């Protein structure tokens, strides 16, 4: 299925091209991608199917690792807040929906502080990456998403 169609179906509140730019930056469109954060263990290879991804993610989380999962690289610490399981986070539609919810929440909070929509979007993207309205701008993440959105 075409990604833009999938994004529209699963996350209609976020422009499909915006979501595509985030996903390209986060996972390179790999639905089974796992990123280990904070100097954690590195995977010797990325999972190639959902069963491998779920098993690897559960093992990493049980071992105390902080990880990002799936297309939108949903952080393991967000699963409870989002009402998701590890199995669900590797469902492409649920992952895109979760990514959109996180971005929407960030945008709502940023908009309350920043009137200009484009500036609020930059801050929302920054928070998507780092949890902070400024760090994702400083570390180049927001620029990378912007560049990926133009390709």
Q: Language-model features: where?
A:
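Eukaryotic N-terminal accessory cofactor-binding modules
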Residues: 42-44
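Non-catalytic cell-wall polysaccharide-engagement segments
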Residues: 1-18, 25-33, 46-72, 76-151
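Early exported N-terminus immediately downstream of N-terminal targeting peptides
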Residues: 34-39
